[in-house]
Amino acid sequence: MTDATVLFAVREFPQSAGVAAEQLRKIRDELKTHGLEVRWASTADDAQAVLRTEAALAAAVVDWDLPHPATGGSDTGGAEVLRHVGRRFHNLPVFLATAGEDLEHLPLWVAETVIGYLWPLEDTAPFIAGRIAGAARGYQHNLLPPFFKALRRFDHAHEYSWHTPAHSGGVAFLKSPVGRAFHDYFGERLLRSDLSISVEELGSLFEHTGPVGAAERNAARVFGAERTYFVLHGDSTCDRMVGHFSVTRDEIALVDRNCHKSVLHGLVLSGARPVYLVPTRNGYGLAGPLPPAELQAQSVLSRTSRNPLTQGAVSPDAQYAVLTNSTYDGLCYDTLQVARALAPSTPRLHFDEAWFAYARFHPLYAGRYGMAVGPDTFPGPERPTVFSTQSTHKMLAALSQSAMVHINPAPRAPVEHERFNEAFMMHGTTSPLYPMIASLDVATAMMDGPHGRCLIDEAVTEAIRFRQAVVRIGRRIAAAGDRPEWFFGVWQPESVTDPATGQRLPFADAPAELLRTEASCWQLEPDANWHGFTGLTEGYCLLDPVKVTLTCPGIDAIGQMTDQGIPARVLTAYLATRNIVVEKTDSYTTLILFSMGITKGKWGTLMDALMDFKSLYDHNAPLERLLPELVAAHPHRYTGQTLRELCQEMHHHLRDARLVELLDTAFQDLPEPVTPPQHCYQRLIRGGTERVRLADAANRVAAAMVTVTPPGIPVLMPGENTGALDGPLLRYLTALESFDRRFPGFRSETHGVTLAPDTGDYLIECVRQIPAQQAARAAGEHLTAPTPNPLGPPLPPG
């Protein structure tokens, strides 16, 4: 047992005189011989601070009469500490130190929290320390989840390796200077846990047996699924896997246009024919949810019947639907509403929850995640099978690329394990990295029980504090009158309602307890100006508190632009010089994530940087001082320019080019589909495509996805027509091209676009034009008739 701690929450200080303190010191010394450190806390507040921050805690000794500051409550200090243990820990061994005559007067709930009682002066120090150490060892042993426990057990056996990988527990690295450097950096334990699937004791990832299978079953229980699969290549592989399993060639798939590119890859692999569903957008350019009306059966039928690709489908009914939940900017659906709306249109529903693996573990998100849809919440034969793909590493504690697929199957679309496992193995590897499996196992264990709720609650609480702090500082600046009144804002409700009293409160003044416990405070009320989305219904969508969007002056949520503006790209360029890297930057907004790793010091540093930026802007500081690397890289463009001048020039360009307006039009008016994505991919790999300048790209068929970041959503999918030169898509891309030329160093991140080496022109991949007779034949094959199935007629839908 190593790195374990025992809390002594007792009245006596470590240096106190008296026989009781002396006996406690003897017990402490005995515990050290068992490899246990003691943290001493002499007040309830100190003890609770240790409980919040000491992750190595393995046992606690709590004095019932521990003092605490007067709070007006009836609890003793010891009672407060015990309640805190119950809220935060599952089965932590707690010994209550009290006089024997006090037992009959203790509340009944105390016996449910403690595992025993101590009278320090009535037993010897070695005996008491042995009891505590034994309980701590048992707690640590039971704390470990199935796979991680088995991996540690195997490592402790120190067996010789006669199997892959060839580095043999890291030994091979020690035979080379550079290898030795690698070994020293990562350490022997990591390298010895990099094992082969030949180690039967650890089970099989492909067969889901042994400790691996036990870990997946445990994850299914914790995440609320009937079946869970561990995936070691990220949520992108999860998306491809589920899409490849759920829909086959020439079947119809309903696809949220606000989807990740991996969803498209699944369509390419399966040969499905996509029908896109269009989300709302607001004045900031942020993508909203799919409106409820978009999911209704009549609307889906209308989109399907108008889509040329469905003319050649094997059935007019969609076999699969996929939505992003939550969105990149933190918008979460009522998943039961979504499932009920889409149930008449598809038997399989996939929620891509890459950024939302924590949702089940906090009451704010109740009913907002895929696995909330099951036989208990949606009884009856209409319920669709639900898949949830989660990038565990993004917002929980797991190694990069560690992900999970959760499944709640329904009778109308059964998911037989043997069939799904074929897709799983097709997208998996026979050489898994065992530390990644262990990290998924540990991430699951961290979320299991009250500790998981506490971890997510801390992230929510810190996000709320930051949100309120930004607004309060803005108000103080406006009230001071000694400086320009502007400051950054936060995209969030301006006021909230306390359901207990009906009182309407400014968001910045609302009690943090209300904001972290009442989901209605975060719901997008229909047609509220602060969010700028239309067509929503009550309770349909919720803003995730931990995804914080900072807003810059220049535009509001309904798209009204002001004379003064600070484009967010300039802000994030400055933040980068302060070693602050944000998650996403749009024209006038920037996204930051409050994960479990966020601390007050971390967001306090961000707040200080925002204040410094304001001061530099107000004093018209030169760019050489703020962004020296930018000026050095482009001296002819930025030398002599000030921060305020750059912001204003960029703001005027965005306004005059109507970039935000063009963005909305490009995303709302979908290009016309011409051919399935799989056909374009086949042309791509056989040299049947070419890169085309925007000026020559009118009415061409795209061969690759074009995704603009910001906002990170596809504007053009493979198989779609680019439209006219003055159409919404090419006008928008041309405006981006113009922006990049005028503001070097602030280039848009546009996937699917390359730059001409001689001119810097945008180039997009298009299907090479073919003679008319070949075009007619291709159109006939891909629009009017399904691809021939060599295995016979297709299976019945559903």
Please report, for each region that a protein language model flagged, where it lies by residue:
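Structural motif
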Residues: 9-18, 42-44, 62-66, 97-100, ...
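Conserved N-terminal alpha-helix of the aminotransferase class I/II PLP-enzyme fold
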Residues: 189-237
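Non-catalytic terminal extensions of PLP-dependent enzymes
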Residues: 52-55, 102, 110-204, 221, ...
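Hydrophobic positions in alpha-helices of CheY-like receiver
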Residues: 84-85, 338, 342, 610
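Conserved acidic segment of CheY-like receiver
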Residues: 2-31, 39-40, 60, 95, ...
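Short beta-alpha junction loops
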Residues: 12-14, 96-103, 354-363
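Conserved PLP-enzyme active-site core in the AAT-like
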Residues: 41-44, 49-53, 67, 237-248, ...
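Conserved phosphotransfer microenvironments
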Residues: 19-25, 44, 56-89, 98-105
